[in-house]
From Swiss-Prot:
Pfam families: Peptidase_M17, Peptidase_M17_N. The keyword Ion transport does not apply. Its main location: cytoplasm. Binds 2 manganese ions per subunit. This is Probable cytosol aminopeptidase.
Length: 498
């Protein structure tokens, strides 16, 4: 695995060795501190001129330093318009800066801009972007080519010079806990399914106990007793036993109702008897991206000691087509008592979530439930890979989620729910069917889930296009993005902590 850079914060000082990184605004503006760190204003101007560098957000330029100062390289990083920078922008700046460190073991970032004071949380966001950019998943590479993309062989020591290093350091303690959560989610999604089955995933979740998270794991026997016929119907085609993991973080007074997050955890999805095409099926190791995000979120909340009571529940199964597998036409009874006709065994995620959602609502009676799932290809057709689909029965919760997405760059787009769509999942033989056909596929899937949350405020995030295989950016370079951890941490931080 990649080595995380060691990051510290200090007052402004001239860099003594390694890489000197300075910020430049759109149009070429820079602070006096940047000029000092680069060896003079003319040097910055010259590097920008010969590189065609304009200071656009996330763009970089560099020059080898040949003086006896001890600095090996000067890097300019564009920040765009300083007055318009948000959380996601600082992550991009940090990621872009880290990408230019190369093999250097030391780097100094001078965090100063003209006529602008950079706050501690902005410095922490930049540092978070550096950590996330440093991430690689190379656990199974026996020969690693570190020169392939210029990333360092060793963990870089990075000093960030900022006006208020004490505040930045405190903000970074929170940001680093969030980084831990994102990286855990990425690791889980990247892990191959022959290594990470339901049992192994549950064991990874149990490691959160050392952070103070209470963990409970239900096996097949316990789920049968609870009547979870929908989840168990999916699992019956695999020799690997299912698990339901309950994670509890108590960071507020015990009488406060918890917030709840539920994740789809299909560790590998062949489609079952309604088997998928072979091409691209290898990506279905990531069909547990929702469960990975919920696990990563619980790690982040516990790591930063969030002042909230939070529940994370993940349903872990493997969808396989053996002789005991669920068939199209089967009818299963969910924990809620509602019956479901299985039209398509490849619409399995909603069956897993049906029981997980009802269990969460019935046992914990939370303030709200948010579920995450790589649920439908239809949402990718509608929104591509830059927004996750948002469905909700509560406008206030939907607005809060949308705003958190805009702030973090983990963007959402709300799609409709309605009685017309709900009628499409009615069945002639059961209370409902698990697939209504091609039209409005992501909407009818959401309507299905809505039948299992009662009157509780609820939102469904369809992350099929964003949790895995989404386009690389300045701070996410691997197949798994860790989507959802930063989004939901921000939601909790802004609205639900005491």
């Amino acid at each position: 695995m990649s080595k995380r850079p060691s990051i510290s914060f200090s007052d402004f000082a001239a860099p003594e060795k390694g890489v000197s990184i300075v910020l430049v605004a759109k149009g070429g503006g820079f602070a006096d501190e940047a000029a000092q760190a680069a060896g003079g204003a003319e040097k910055i101007k010259r590097i920008a001129e010969i590189s065609g560098f304009t200071g656009a957000l996330g763009k970089t330029a560099e020059a080898i330093e040949t003086t006896s100062s001890g600095v090996d390289k000067i890097v300019l990083v564009g920040v765009g318009e300083p007055g318009k920078l948000g959380n996601d922008d600082w992550l991009k700046i940090g990621g872009a800066a880290f990408s230019r460190i190369g093999k250097a073991e030391r780097a100094t970032v001078t965090l100063a801009l003209p006529e602008t004071t950079i706050a501690g949380d902005e410095a922490a966001d930049l540092a978070l972007g550096m950590i996330l950019r440093s991430y690689k998943f190379e656990r199974y590479k026996t020969r690693k080519n570190n020169e392939e993309n210029g990333d360092p062989k060793h963990a870089a020591k990075i000093s960030i010079c900022v006006a208020d290093p004490h505040t930045a350091k405190r903000a970074f303690e929170v940001a680093e806990a969030v980084a831990d959560g994102v990286i855990q989610a990425r690791n889980l999604v990247n892990e191959p399914a022959n290594i990470l089955g339901p049992v192994e995933f549950a064991q990874e979740a149990e490691k959160l106990e050392k952070l103070g998270v209470k963990i409970e794991v239900l096996g097949e026997k316990e789920m049968k007793k609870l009547g979870m016929g929908a989840l168990l119907g999916v699992a019956q085609g695999s020799v690997r036993p299912p698990r339901l993991v309950i994670m509890e973080w108590q960071g507020a007074k015990s009488k406060e109702k918890p917030v709840a997050f539920v994740g789809k955890g299909v560790v590998f999805d062949t489609g079952g008897i309604s088997i998928k095409p072979a091409a691209g099926m290898e990506d279905m190791k990531g069909d547990m991206g929702g469960a990975a995000a919920v696990t990563g979120l619980m790690r982040a909340l516990a790591g930063r000691k969030a002042k909230v009571n939070a529940i994370g529940i993940i349903g872990l199964v493997e969808n396989m087509p053996d002789g005991n597998a669920q068939r199209p036409g089967d009818i299963v009874t969910s924990m809620s008592g509602q019956t479901i006709e299985v039209i398509n065994t490849d619409a399995e995620g909603r069956l897993v979530l049906a029981d997980a959602l009802h269990y969460t609502n019935d046992r914990f009676k939370p303030r709200f439930i948010i579920n995450l799932a790589t649920l439908t290809g239809a949402v990718m057709v509608a929104l591509g890979q830059y927004h996750a689909g948002l469905f909700s029965n509560d406008d206030e919760l939907a607005d809060q989620l949308y705003d958190a997405g805009q702030l973090t760059g983990e963007k959402l787009w709300r799609l409709p729910l309605g009685t017309e769509y709900d009628k499409m999942i009615d069945s002639k033989f059961a209370d409902m069917k698990n697939s209504a056909g091609r039209y409005g596929g992501s909407i009818t899937a959401a309507q299905f889930l809505k039948r299992f949350v009662g009157e509780t405020a609820w939102a469904h995030l369809d992350v099929a296009g964003t949790a895995m295989g989404s386009p690389a950016n300045e701070y996410s370079q691997t197949w798994a993005s860790g989507y959802g951890v930063r989004l939901l941490d921000r939601l909790v931080r802004d609205h639900f902590e005491s």
